């Protein structure tokens, strides 16, 4: 019997509340966008299967709450993640400055050697941009991690961000991960987490 996929990768989206993590996930998984996405409580996830270098890759993408009060809940989701996207808002300098704190969370909770990607979201809001591309790029380069600016609103680089992460994980894992191993890691179906009513736009 042919397997449904060759690889199963668990990805995690982390970053301050309001930077657009949920919107990035919606754009990539469902190709939809909403101006007023309600804040995530705890975690939510979506699944999308892609073709990568002739292989079928199933991406299970977890969207975590950025609020401090949920930090203890979401920290457990770092374990077992193959790749982690650290997202900031290019119009919010604080969210960029807090990237270092999020990277420390990865070091504390995630599996050693986990793939990382820095994502500057809301790149369409050029008139409000405060974090310059060159500054973020130099920071990412100093850490040896890839960097992309994205816009969930106009879909710019969203696909590229997740494909970059998937390709990196695949290269790191090589051919050692067979379907039998990865299927055992987690077996879930697409679903929606519970959200609260604090609304806020994300681009």
UniProtKB/Swiss-Prot annotation:
Gene3D superfamilies: P-loop containing nucleotide triphosphate hydrolases
Activity regulation description: Rab activation is generally mediated by a guanine exchange factor (GEF), while inactivation through hydrolysis of bound GTP is catalyzed by a GTPase activating protein (GAP).
InterPro entries recorded: P-loop_NTPase, Rab, Small_GTP-bd, Small_GTPase
Keywords, ordered alphabetically: Autophagy, Cytoplasm, Endoplasmic reticulum, Golgi apparatus, GTP-binding, Lipoprotein, Membrane, Nucleotide-binding, Prenylation, Protein transport, Transport
Membrane topology classification: Peripheral membrane protein; Lipid-anchor
Region (Disordered): 180-203
Pfam family, one: Ras
Source organism, top-level taxon: Eukaryota
Molecular-function GO term, any one: GTPase activity
Main location: endoplasmic reticulum
Location of the protein in the cell: Endoplasmic reticulum membrane; Golgi apparatus membrane; Cytoplasm; Preautophagosomal structure membrane
Record-linked SMART domains: RAB, RAN, RAS, RHO
Extent of motif Effector region: 37-45
Residues holding GTP: 15-23, 33-40, 63-67, 121-124, 151-153
Lipidation sites (S-geranylgeranyl cysteine): 202-203
Recorded GO CC terms: endomembrane system; endoplasmic reticulum membrane; Golgi membrane; phagophore assembly site membrane
Gene Ontology terms describing biological process: autophagosome assembly; intracellular protein transport
Family, similarity comment: Belongs to the small GTPase superfamily. Rab family.
Role: The small GTPases Rab are key regulators of intracellular membrane trafficking, from the formation of transport vesicles to their fusion with membranes. Rabs cycle between an inactive GDP-bound form and an active GTP-bound form that is able to recruit to membranes different set of downstream effectors directly responsible for vesicle formation, movement, tethering and fusion. Ypt-1 regulates the trafficking of secretory vesicles from the endoplasmic reticulum (ER) to the Golgi.
Descriptive protein name: GTP-binding protein ypt1
Gene: ypt-1
């Amino acid at each position: 019997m042919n397997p449904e996929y060759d690889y199963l990768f668990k990805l995690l989206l982390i970053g301050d509340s309001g930077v657009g993590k949920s919107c990035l996930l919606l754009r990539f998984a469902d190709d939809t966008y909403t101006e007023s996405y309600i804040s995530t409580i705890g975690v939510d996830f979506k699944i999308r299967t892609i073709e990568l270098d002739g292989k079928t890759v199933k991406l299970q993408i977890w969207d975590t709450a950025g609020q401090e009060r949920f930090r203890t809940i979401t920290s457990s989701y770092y374990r077992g993640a193959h790749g982690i996207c650290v997202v900031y808002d290019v119009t919010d300098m604080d969210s960029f400055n807090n990237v270092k704190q999020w990277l420390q969370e990865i070091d504390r909770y995630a599996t050693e050697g986990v793939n990382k990607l820095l994502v500057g979201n809301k790149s369409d809001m050029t008139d409000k941009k405060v974090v310059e591309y060159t500054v973020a790029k130099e920071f990412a380069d100093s850490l040896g991690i890839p960097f992309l600016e994205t816009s969930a609103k106009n879909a710019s680089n969203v696909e590229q961000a997740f494909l970059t992460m998937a390709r990196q994980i695949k290269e790191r894992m090589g051919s050692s991960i067979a379907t039998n191993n990865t299927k055992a890691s987690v077996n879930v179906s697409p679903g929606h987490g519970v959200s609260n009513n604090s609304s806020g736009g994300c681009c």
